[in-house]
Swiss-Prot record:
GO terms for cellular component: cytoplasm; cytosol; mitochondrial inner membrane; mitochondrial matrix; mitochondrion. This is Folylpolyglutamate synthase, mitochondrial. Residues 1-39 form a transit peptide. The gene is FPGS. Pathway: Cofactor biosynthesis; tetrahydrofolylpolyglutamate biosynthesis. InterPro entries: Folylpolyglutamate_synth, Folylpolyglutamate_synth_CS, Folylpolyglutamate_synth_euk, Mur-like_cat_sf, Mur_ligase_C_dom_sf, Mur_ligase_cen. Signal peptide: none annotated.
Length: 585
């Protein structure tokens, strides 16, 4: 049987029953076919979307034989044309394009919320999703409904199916490309006033970078991540991120190390892009009240400063008068980037910052004796910020009058990230237990397609969890360095201190466990003290460890249990799905 025939049979197996009328590709929004669709449920749509994920073995082959990245952008333009749009159609979306290594999602969230406070209808495309894939496409801050997602998914899927060439090596776009295309169509159909577009990976060759004329661009803090795709130095990564610059389109960035900042400056000059350096948020607060941010953590101030500049620039470009009164200008130093304006944030800007929500980033949930600290940090720099936030939050907590306090780490890391370096940063938090599990909500779960991931095998992720456990054990065996978070001469009980309150180690200190899925890990951590989770029945889901029983007793008797979930946004999403079942409705 031919490869094309096999592929056709496979698509028939996963596609919904029923047929659609074939139509020729026509440009513009009017090109949608009139579909006679059967009752296609949301989960069916997501399962079909998941067939566009690259299987693990094929993904490895692609990495070894990666072609010209510029060709990938040309392919994306072809997909766009097959979907019924041309690149120039995207100009009307008034796009804000944001990239960076850390904080780009939070910066997008701040920016979107600020502009929504002006009464504008906003679109927001982000990745990854935490619980449901429809979170990636938002209108006015809310994920599109299951019904709207399903409708747009099948329209786009059938359009691409009808226009594919079976002789082509790539007949359908991959998962992320498909969702990017879908976001463009949703935003145009919903007639948003603007679209905030978060880059997937990198910038220069990311599929979001097919846009021609964004209104403004932003680059958040840079760091080392996705080295297999972007390069293994800050300079190489900065070059990739600067690829979103467009001639004549204003761009803003935050303070970066000298070398990558120089790369961004040179890249902007080559492209004739006016690039500005954002003053710190403190400069915008001078002479006015301190700004309250809806997202916790000191590192969010940098993201908020960038969001304010980007939002103000967008408002000015679109002729809005109420965009913040300028303060005294600060001259730029010779050879450095020009500084962005220092202005007084308007009441609507302040409101937007205050009401920003972005789940899974410095998020805190209290449920009885358990407090969950959720942050998807996955680079060394973002993990430093996560640890600082976690320790400051613990410092503010009231200590129990009686009973013990237990600290638990729930961790996973994926891809080519250096998990040993991340775990070393977490060690000074004095965890009693370190729990490792894959980003799999439940074992053998087929009822929720949103959480399915075909790009890795179960064997691979479990072996990686065991490697995390070994790294953690070695760190404690080596009795690593004094606390890197303390400052010489700093008073341990001072208000600015990051040192934790005294936390006498238990006899099981630094113990670690590996579970086969998130659900089993949460059952063990909660020990029946959360009505959502039944007490575990050892050794269900547990790769055997001698301290499981003794640890269960400690958790059952503890007055307070503090759980930090970090290392992967997908892990955080799986935990949120189980802690907040309403998010899956």
């Amino acid at each position: 049987m031919s490869r094309a025939r096999c592929h056709a049979l496979f698509l028939a197996a996963v596609s919904p029953r029923g047929a659609t009328t074939r139509v020729a590709v026509r440009r513009g929004l009017s090109a949608w076919p009139v579909l006679q669709e059967p009752d296609m449920e949301y989960q069916d749509a997501v399962r079909t979307l998941n067939t566009l994920q690259t299987n693990a073995n094929y993904l490895e082959m692609v990495k070894r034989k990666r072609g010209d990245p510029q060709t990938q952008l040309e392919a994306m333009k072809l997909y766009l044309a097959r979907s019924g749009l041309q690149v120039e159609d995207l100009d009307q979306l008034n796009i804000i394009h944001i990239t960076g290594t850390k904080g780009k999602g939070s910066t997008c969230a701040f920016t979107e919320r600020i502009l929504r406070s002006y009464g504008l209808k906003t679109g927001f495309f982000s990745s990854p999703h935490l619980v449901q894939v429809r979170e990636r496409i938002r209108i006015n801050g809310q994920p599109i409904s299951s019904e709207l997602f399903t409708k747009h998914f099948w329209r786009l899927y059938h359009r691409l199916e009808e226009t594919k060439d079976d002789s082509s090596c790539v007949s359908m776009p991959g998962y992320f490309r498909f969702l990017t295309l879908m976001a463009f169509h949703v935003f145009l159909q919903e007639k948003v006033d603007l679209a905030v577009l978060e880059v997937g990976i990198g910038g220069a060759y990311d599929c979001t970078n097919i846009i021609r004329k964004p209104v403004v661009c932003g680059i958040t803090s840079l760091g080392i991540d996705h080295t297999g795709l972007l390069g293994d130095t800050m300079e190489k990564i900065a070059w990739q991120k600067g690829g979103i610059f467009k001639s004549g389109v204003p761009a803003f960035t935050v303070l970066q190390p000298d070398e990558p900042l120089a790369v961004l400056r040179d890249r902007a000059q080559q492209i004739s892009c006016p690039l500005y350096l954002c003053p710190p948020l403190q400069a915008l607060e001078e002479g006015g009240p301190p700004l309250t941010l809806g997202l916790e953590g000191e590192h969010q101030r940098s993201n908020a400063a960038l969001a304010l500049q980007v939002a103000r620039c967008w408002l000015q470009q679109k002729g809005y008068q109420d965009a913040g009164e300028l303060k005294a200008s600060r001259p730029s130093l010779p050879g450095q980037l020009p500084l962005a304006p220092v202005f007084q944030p308007t009441p609507r800007m302040q409101q937007g910052l205050r009401h920003t929500e972005w789940p899974g980033r410095t998020q805190l949930l209290r449920r009885g004796p358990l407090t969950w600290y959720l942050d998807g940090a996955h680079t060394t720099s973002s993990m430093q910020a996560c640890v600082r936030w976690f320790r400051q939050a613990l410092h503010r907590c009231e200590r129990p009058d009686s009973g013990s306090e237990v600290r638990v780490l729930l961790f996973n890391s994926t891809g080519d990230r250096d998990s040993a370096a991340l775990l070393k940063l977490l060690q000074p938090c004095q965890f009693d237990y370190a729990i490792f599990c894959p980003n799999l909500a439940e074992m053998a779960s087929t009822d929720n397609a949103d959480q399915q991931n075909f790009t890795v095998t179960l064997d691979q992720v479990l072996l990686r969890c065991l490697a995390h456990q070994q790294h953690w054990s070695r760190l404690h065996e080596e009795q690593v360095s004094p606390d890197p978070w303390s400052t010489p001469g700093q008073e341990q009980d001072g208000p600015a201190s990051l040192l934790l309150a005294p936390h006498p180690p238990h006899t099981h200190s630094a113990s670690s466990l590996v579970f086969s899925c998130i659900s089993h890990a949460l059952q063990w951590i909660t020990q029946g003290r959360d009505p959502l989770f039944q007490p575990p029945s050892p050794p269900r889901g547990l790769l055997a460890h001698p301290v499981a029983d003794s640890g269960a007793t400690v958790l059952q008797e503890a007055a307070d249990i503090h759980v930090l979930v970090t290392g992967s946004l997908h892990l955080v999403g799986g935990v949120l799905k189980l802690l907040e079942p309403s998010l899956s409705q």
